[in-house]
A protein has these predicted regions:
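A charged N-terminal "starter" segment
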Residues: 1-117, 122-132
C-alpha cells in the first residue's frame, strides 16, 4: 500500500477554510492524473483496453474532464449522467451506458450520443430495439 499524503499542510488548509465554506471537497488533480496513467500503463499489454469512469461515483464535470483528458471513457447509468458527458464533449465510444429498469428516453438519448449500450438482461433487447435501436 502506498503512503497517502495531503497535497497541502495545516497552514494552507486553514487558509482554504477561511476562503471556502465547509463542508467542501478537495481533489488532487496531479494524483488523479497519476493514478489514471498508472492504470492505463498496467493494462497496456491489452491492446484496445479502455477504462470507463463510473460517473455515478462522483458526477463532477471537472473530475470527468480530467479523466477524459487521460483517456478514460465514462460509464453512465442515467439521463443526467449522459447530459454531463455531452456537456464535456464525451460522446460515441467514450460512453458506456449500462442501466437497469431504464426509461425509453434514456436509451434514446444514449443512441443519439452514439454511446455503447451494455445490456445485462436478455429481456431488454426488444425494448432497446423499440426505443433506442
Amino acid at each position: 500500500m502506498t503512503d497517502k499524503k495531503l497535497p497541502f499542510n495545516k497552514a494552507q488548509m486553514e487558509k482554504i477554510i477561511e476562503k471556502f465554506p465547509t463542508p467542501f471537497h478537495i481533489y488532487d488533480e496531479k494524483d488523479i492524473r497519476h493514478r489514471a496513467r498508472a492504470l492505463r500503463q498496467a493494462f497496456s499489454w491489452n491492446e484496445g483496453y479502455k477504462e470507463y469512469y463510473a460517473v455515478k461515483a462522483c458526477p463532477n464535470p471537472i473530475i470527468m474532464s480530467i479523466l477524459r483528458d487521460e483517456g478514460c471513457g465514462m460509464d453512465c447509468s442515467s439521463y443526467a449522467e449522459l447530459m454531463l458527458c455531452e456537456a464535456i464533449g464525451v460522446v460515441g465510444d467514450g460512453i458506456m451506458f449500462s442501466s437497469n429498469d431504464t426509461p425509453a428516453k434514456d436509451f434514446e438519448y444514449a443512441r443519439r450520443l452514439n454511446a455503447t449500450i451494455n445490456l445485462d438482461d436478455i429481456t431488454h433487447i426488444e425494448f432497446l430495439k423499440e426505443h433506442g435501436g
